[in-house]
Amino acid sequence: MKKLNFEAPINSLSFGNVSVNFLRVLKQEEIDISLHPIGDQGDFSAFNTIDNDFKQWTSSIAAQRLAKLDKTTPTLKLWHLNGSEKTLGQNQYLYTFYELDSPTVEEVNIVKMQKHVFFSSTEAANTFKQKGCTNVSVVPLGFDPDFKELPKEFDKETIHFGLIGKFERRKNTQALIQLWLNKYGNNPKYQLSCLVNNSFLNQEQMQQAVNSSTMNNHWNNINFLPPLKTNEEVNILMN
Protein backbone atom coordinates (compact mmCIF):
# COMPACT_ATOMS: atom_id res chain seq x y z
CA MET A 1 0.00 0.00 0.00
CA LYS A 2 1.30 3.45 -0.94
CA LYS A 3 2.00 5.81 1.98
CA LEU A 4 1.42 9.54 2.00
CA ASN A 5 1.56 12.44 4.43
CA PHE A 6 -1.31 14.82 3.76
CA GLU A 7 -0.97 18.28 5.29
CA ALA A 8 -3.99 20.51 4.79
CA PRO A 9 -6.71 22.50 6.58
CA ILE A 10 -10.07 20.88 7.33
CA ASN A 11 -12.66 23.65 7.59
CA SER A 12 -15.50 25.42 5.79
CA LEU A 13 -13.27 27.76 3.77
CA SER A 14 -12.18 27.19 0.18
CA PHE A 15 -8.94 25.37 1.03
CA GLY A 16 -10.85 23.26 3.55
CA ASN A 17 -13.42 22.18 0.98
CA VAL A 18 -10.70 21.17 -1.47
CA SER A 19 -8.87 19.28 1.29
CA VAL A 20 -11.94 17.24 2.17
CA ASN A 21 -12.43 16.30 -1.48
CA PHE A 22 -8.78 15.26 -1.73
CA LEU A 23 -9.31 13.05 1.32
CA ARG A 24 -12.40 11.50 -0.24
CA VAL A 25 -10.41 10.38 -3.26
CA LEU A 26 -7.36 9.28 -1.26
CA LYS A 27 -9.58 7.12 0.93
CA GLN A 28 -11.28 5.67 -2.12
CA GLU A 29 -7.86 4.80 -3.58
CA GLU A 30 -6.91 3.10 -0.28
CA ILE A 31 -3.79 5.20 0.26
CA ASP A 32 -2.16 4.78 3.67
CA ILE A 33 -2.48 8.38 4.85
CA SER A 34 -1.08 10.30 7.80
CA LEU A 35 -3.17 13.45 8.15
CA HIS A 36 -1.41 16.57 9.45
CA PRO A 37 -4.17 19.18 9.87
CA ILE A 38 -3.25 22.82 9.42
CA GLY A 39 -4.87 24.88 12.14
CA ASP A 40 -7.69 23.14 13.99
CA GLN A 41 -7.88 19.38 14.24
CA GLY A 42 -10.79 19.35 11.84
CA ASP A 43 -13.98 21.36 11.49
CA PHE A 44 -16.64 19.40 9.62
CA SER A 45 -19.52 21.74 10.48
CA ALA A 46 -20.01 22.73 6.82
CA PHE A 47 -20.02 19.13 5.60
CA ASN A 48 -23.36 18.03 7.01
CA THR A 49 -23.81 15.30 4.38
CA ILE A 50 -20.56 13.47 5.21
CA ASP A 51 -21.10 10.27 7.17
CA ASN A 52 -19.62 9.63 10.61
CA ASP A 53 -17.39 6.82 9.30
CA PHE A 54 -15.47 9.35 7.19
CA LYS A 55 -15.10 11.74 10.12
CA GLN A 56 -13.87 8.93 12.37
CA TRP A 57 -11.40 7.85 9.70
CA THR A 58 -9.93 11.36 9.45
CA SER A 59 -9.65 11.56 13.25
CA SER A 60 -7.83 8.24 13.27
CA ILE A 61 -5.28 9.11 10.58
CA ALA A 62 -4.64 12.45 12.30
CA ALA A 63 -4.13 10.87 15.71
CA GLN A 64 -1.56 8.40 14.31
CA ARG A 65 0.42 10.94 12.27
CA LEU A 66 3.43 11.22 14.60
CA ALA A 67 3.58 7.51 15.35
CA LYS A 68 3.89 6.86 11.60
CA LEU A 69 6.22 9.78 10.86
CA ASP A 70 8.95 8.84 8.39
CA LYS A 71 11.07 11.35 6.50
CA THR A 72 11.08 9.15 3.39
CA THR A 73 7.27 9.22 3.08
CA PRO A 74 6.22 11.76 0.42
CA THR A 75 4.02 14.65 1.51
CA LEU A 76 1.14 16.26 -0.34
CA LYS A 77 0.52 19.71 1.06
CA LEU A 78 -2.50 21.86 0.25
CA TRP A 79 -1.80 25.42 1.28
CA HIS A 80 -0.83 28.96 0.33
CA LEU A 81 2.64 29.53 -1.07
CA ASN A 82 3.39 31.69 1.96
CA GLY A 83 3.81 29.09 4.68
CA SER A 84 4.77 26.20 2.43
CA GLU A 85 8.49 26.69 3.02
CA LYS A 86 8.06 24.35 5.98
CA THR A 87 8.15 20.74 4.85
CA LEU A 88 7.44 17.30 6.24
CA GLY A 89 10.22 14.94 5.23
CA GLN A 90 12.31 14.99 2.10
CA ASN A 91 9.79 15.09 -0.73
CA GLN A 92 6.96 17.61 -0.50
CA TYR A 93 4.44 18.05 -3.30
CA LEU A 94 2.41 21.25 -3.05
CA TYR A 95 -1.05 21.95 -4.44
CA THR A 96 -1.87 25.63 -4.35
CA PHE A 97 -3.76 28.52 -5.93
CA TYR A 98 -2.13 31.66 -7.28
CA GLU A 99 -4.09 34.74 -8.34
CA LEU A 100 -1.38 37.27 -9.22
CA ASP A 101 0.84 37.76 -12.27
CA SER A 102 4.14 38.86 -10.71
CA PRO A 103 5.66 36.31 -8.31
CA THR A 104 8.05 37.69 -5.73
CA VAL A 105 11.57 36.37 -5.23
CA GLU A 106 10.36 34.72 -2.03
CA GLU A 107 7.48 32.98 -3.81
CA VAL A 108 9.76 31.69 -6.55
CA ASN A 109 12.18 30.31 -3.96
CA ILE A 110 9.37 28.54 -2.10
CA VAL A 111 8.20 26.92 -5.35
CA LYS A 112 11.71 25.81 -6.28
CA MET A 113 12.29 24.10 -2.93
CA GLN A 114 9.27 21.81 -3.40
CA LYS A 115 9.61 18.44 -5.08
CA HIS A 116 6.79 19.56 -7.36
CA VAL A 117 4.06 22.22 -7.33
CA PHE A 118 0.61 21.65 -8.80
CA PHE A 119 -1.27 24.83 -9.66
CA SER A 120 -5.00 24.93 -10.28
CA SER A 121 -4.63 27.13 -13.37
CA THR A 122 -2.48 27.12 -16.49
CA GLU A 123 -1.80 30.84 -16.16
CA ALA A 124 -0.30 30.43 -12.69
CA ALA A 125 1.94 27.55 -13.79
CA ASN A 126 3.15 29.46 -16.85
CA THR A 127 3.87 32.53 -14.72
CA PHE A 128 6.27 30.54 -12.54
CA LYS A 129 7.80 28.74 -15.52
CA GLN A 130 8.74 32.16 -16.87
CA LYS A 131 10.57 32.76 -13.59
CA GLY A 132 12.69 29.64 -14.07
CA CYS A 133 10.63 27.12 -12.10
CA THR A 134 10.82 23.76 -13.86
CA ASN A 135 8.97 21.76 -11.19
CA VAL A 136 5.44 23.04 -11.85
CA SER A 137 2.39 21.72 -13.67
CA VAL A 138 -1.37 22.15 -13.81
CA VAL A 139 -4.03 20.00 -12.14
CA PRO A 140 -7.50 21.58 -12.50
CA LEU A 141 -10.01 20.97 -9.75
CA GLY A 142 -12.80 18.49 -10.31
CA PHE A 143 -16.45 18.72 -9.33
CA ASP A 144 -17.43 18.77 -5.67
CA PRO A 145 -20.05 16.05 -5.02
CA ASP A 146 -21.71 18.28 -2.41
CA PHE A 147 -22.92 20.56 -5.19
CA LYS A 148 -25.43 19.22 -7.68
CA GLU A 149 -28.66 20.05 -9.44
CA LEU A 150 -31.73 19.68 -7.25
CA PRO A 151 -35.07 18.35 -8.53
CA LYS A 152 -36.90 21.26 -6.90
CA GLU A 153 -38.39 23.84 -9.28
CA PHE A 154 -37.34 27.43 -8.70
CA ASP A 155 -38.62 30.68 -10.20
CA LYS A 156 -38.07 30.42 -13.94
CA GLU A 157 -39.38 33.89 -14.75
CA THR A 158 -36.55 35.72 -12.98
CA ILE A 159 -32.94 35.65 -14.15
CA HIS A 160 -31.01 35.11 -10.94
CA PHE A 161 -27.39 36.17 -10.46
CA GLY A 162 -25.25 35.05 -7.54
CA LEU A 163 -22.11 36.67 -6.15
CA ILE A 164 -20.25 34.39 -3.74
CA GLY A 165 -16.98 35.11 -1.97
CA LYS A 166 -15.57 37.25 0.85
CA PHE A 167 -16.06 40.99 0.38
CA GLU A 168 -12.54 42.11 -0.57
CA ARG A 169 -10.97 44.93 -2.53
CA ARG A 170 -8.75 42.52 -4.47
CA LYS A 171 -11.87 40.73 -5.70
CA ASN A 172 -13.49 44.01 -6.77
CA THR A 173 -16.63 43.04 -4.86
CA GLN A 174 -17.95 46.59 -4.64
CA ALA A 175 -17.25 47.32 -8.30
CA LEU A 176 -19.04 44.14 -9.41
CA ILE A 177 -22.13 44.95 -7.34
CA GLN A 178 -22.28 48.52 -8.63
CA LEU A 179 -21.77 47.36 -12.21
CA TRP A 180 -24.72 44.98 -11.84
CA LEU A 181 -26.92 47.63 -10.18
CA ASN A 182 -26.18 50.17 -12.89
CA LYS A 183 -27.41 47.71 -15.50
CA TYR A 184 -30.18 45.75 -13.75
CA GLY A 185 -31.01 47.69 -10.57
CA ASN A 186 -34.78 47.74 -9.76
CA ASN A 187 -35.56 45.70 -12.88
CA PRO A 188 -37.96 42.95 -11.67
CA LYS A 189 -36.76 40.55 -14.37
CA TYR A 190 -33.40 40.23 -12.61
CA GLN A 191 -32.31 39.33 -9.08
CA LEU A 192 -28.89 39.40 -7.40
CA SER A 193 -28.09 37.42 -4.26
CA CYS A 194 -24.81 38.31 -2.56
CA LEU A 195 -23.09 35.88 -0.21
CA VAL A 196 -20.12 38.12 0.54
CA ASN A 197 -19.76 38.20 4.32
CA ASN A 198 -16.14 38.67 5.41
CA SER A 199 -15.48 37.25 8.88
CA PHE A 200 -12.43 39.51 9.20
CA LEU A 201 -14.70 42.58 9.22
CA ASN A 202 -16.86 43.49 12.19
CA GLN A 203 -20.58 44.13 11.80
CA GLU A 204 -20.19 47.89 11.41
CA GLN A 205 -17.45 47.54 8.79
CA MET A 206 -19.51 45.01 6.86
CA GLN A 207 -22.55 47.29 6.88
CA GLN A 208 -20.43 50.18 5.65
CA ALA A 209 -19.19 47.98 2.80
CA VAL A 210 -22.78 47.09 1.85
CA ASN A 211 -23.94 50.72 2.01
CA SER A 212 -21.03 51.83 -0.13
CA SER A 213 -21.69 49.09 -2.67
CA THR A 214 -25.35 50.06 -3.02
CA MET A 215 -24.42 53.75 -3.17
CA ASN A 216 -26.61 54.29 -0.09
CA ASN A 217 -29.72 53.66 -2.19
CA HIS A 218 -32.55 51.16 -1.80
CA TRP A 219 -32.79 48.52 -4.51
CA ASN A 220 -35.64 46.03 -4.68
CA ASN A 221 -33.82 43.27 -6.53
CA ILE A 222 -30.61 42.71 -4.54
CA ASN A 223 -30.24 40.60 -1.40
CA PHE A 224 -27.30 40.39 0.99
CA LEU A 225 -27.49 36.97 2.61
CA PRO A 226 -26.23 36.03 6.07
CA PRO A 227 -23.37 33.52 6.27
CA LEU A 228 -24.47 30.04 5.21
CA LYS A 229 -23.24 27.35 7.58
CA THR A 230 -23.34 24.23 5.42
CA ASN A 231 -22.54 23.19 1.87
CA GLU A 232 -26.12 21.96 1.61
CA GLU A 233 -27.37 25.53 2.12
CA VAL A 234 -24.91 26.87 -0.45
CA ASN A 235 -26.07 24.21 -2.91
CA ILE A 236 -29.67 25.38 -2.53
CA LEU A 237 -28.55 28.95 -3.23
CA MET A 238 -26.65 27.89 -6.34
CA ASN A 239 -29.69 26.05 -7.64
Task: Specify the residue positions occupied by each region the protein language model found.
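Acidic anion/phosphate-binding donor-loop and adjacent secondary structure
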Residues: 105-106, 142-158
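A short, glycine/small-residue-rich beta-strand->loop->alpha-helix junction that serves as a flexible
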Residues: 8-18, 171
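Nucleotide-activated donor-binding/catalytic signature segment of Leloir-type glycosyltransferases, i.e.
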Residues: 196, 203-232, 236
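Extended catalytic core of nucleotide-activated donor transferases of GT-like folds
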Residues: 3-5, 44-127, 232-234
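Conserved donor-binding/catalytic core segment of Leloir-type glycosyltransferases
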Residues: 4, 154-171, 177-180, 192-194
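Short donor-sugar binding/catalytic loops of nucleotide-sugar-dependent glycosyltransferases
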Residues: 9-10, 164-168, 198-199, 228
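N-terminal strand-loop element at the rim of the active site
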Residues: 10-13, 23-65, 201
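Donor nucleotide-sugar binding/catalytic pocket of nucleotide-sugar-dependent glycosyltransferases
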Residues: 115-126, 133-149
